């Protein structure tokens, strides 16, 4: 089976990156990552970042940027990230009020369509990264399906976050296959614990669902150290035509630092390659 290159979403090491931008990227490369996905530039220029990444040997795969920000100056932002070698502009989140099924959704569709057209003109992908709230039904469909059925696949592709798909109650591998041919990247994220009624303030809290029984504490984990079936997720990603997998861990766990967690994730993924799960 095809071996997918591995990138790190730099939000995972945001504090380290802010303290030592170049040094942190060097460590990411030394761990064995092939590329990175940005979530801000740490006050660096595009030229500075390109020089640093080129010297280190890291590919710039994608960026997370708000819809409002990219809509305000699409040419500058798309051209800037394209100059780094990025192939994908990704909206990581939609605030309440503008999500599928809500009053401001038409505004979201118009803005995404406009940015998608700009990206298409510049030979870039425009993607949306889900959380769990898109798996609330809007009529007979999940909100995420409403989004992808409303905007055509040539203007908007998927960046499926496998943790949030699972938390939303859907099998990640099956959902990846559902959108085969509509993804450049897949987010690999692991976790333990259970969804609660007030999940989306969720992280690190034990919640009472009203039954008097405490549910297991939700927490993120390095890839391979939680509940996810990554061999199957990776197989589905390859079959669906993804070109990159992106590791993300919103906060560290198991008493490890963010960099240690990132290393645990990439070592686990490389162990799957060694065991032939991901080899040609």
Language-model-derived ranges and their functions:
Residues 1-88, 157, 235, 263-280:
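N-terminal pre-domain/capping segments
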Residues 10-13, 33, 64, 128-129, ...:
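Tryptophan-centric aromatic hotspots in well-structured domains and transmembrane helices
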Residues 14-19, 35-48, 65-73, 96-100, ...:
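Acidic-and-aromatic substrate-binding clefts and catalytic sites of carbohydrate-active enzymes
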Residues 37, 62, 90, 127, ...:
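Conserved beta-strand positions in the central sheet of alpha/beta enzyme cores
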Residues 67-158, 178, 259:
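Active-site acidic/histidine proton-transfer and metal-coordination neighborhood
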Residues 121-227:
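Acidic/histidine-rich catalytic cores of soluble enzymes
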Residues 225-238:
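A short, acidic, amphipathic alpha-helical segment used as a generic capping/interface helix at domain edges
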Residues 242-271:
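C-terminal/domain-terminus segments
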């Amino acid at each position: 089976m095809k071996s997918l290159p591995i990138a790190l979403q730099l939000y995972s090491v945001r504090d380290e990156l802010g303290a030592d931008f170049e040094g942190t990227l060097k460590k990411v490369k030394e761990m064995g990552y092939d590329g990175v996905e940005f979530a801000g530039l740490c006050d660096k220029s595009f030229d500075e970042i390109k020089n640093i990444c080129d010297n280190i040997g890291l590919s710039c795969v994608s960026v997370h940027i708000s819809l409002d920000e990219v809509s305000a100056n699409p040419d500058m932002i798309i051209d800037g990230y394209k100059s780094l070698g990025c192939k994908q502009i990704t909206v990581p989140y939609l605030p309440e009020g503008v999500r599928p099924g809500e009053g401001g959704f038409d505004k979201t569709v118009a803005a995404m369509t406009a940015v998608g057209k700009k990206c298409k003109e510049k030979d870039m992908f425009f993607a949306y990264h889900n959380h769990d709230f898109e798996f609330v039904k809007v009529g007979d469909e999940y909100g995420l399906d409403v989004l992808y059925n409303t905007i055509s696949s040539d203007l908007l592709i998927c960046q499926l976050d496998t943790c949030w798909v699972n938390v939303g109650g859907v099998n990640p591998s099956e959902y990846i296959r559902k959108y085969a041919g509509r993804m450049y990247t897949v987010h690999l994220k692991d976790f333990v614990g259970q969804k609660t009624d007030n999940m989306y303030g969720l992280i690190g809290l034990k919640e009472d669902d009203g039954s008097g029984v405490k549910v297991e504490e939700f927490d993120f984990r390095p890839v391979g150290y939680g509940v996810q079936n990554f061999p199957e997720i990776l197989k589905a990603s390859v079959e669906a035509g993804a070109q990159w997998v992106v590791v993300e861990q919103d906060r560290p766990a198991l008493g490890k630092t963010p960099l240690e967690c990132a290393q645990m994730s990439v070592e686990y993924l490389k162990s799957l390659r060694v065991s032939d799960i991901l080899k040609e």
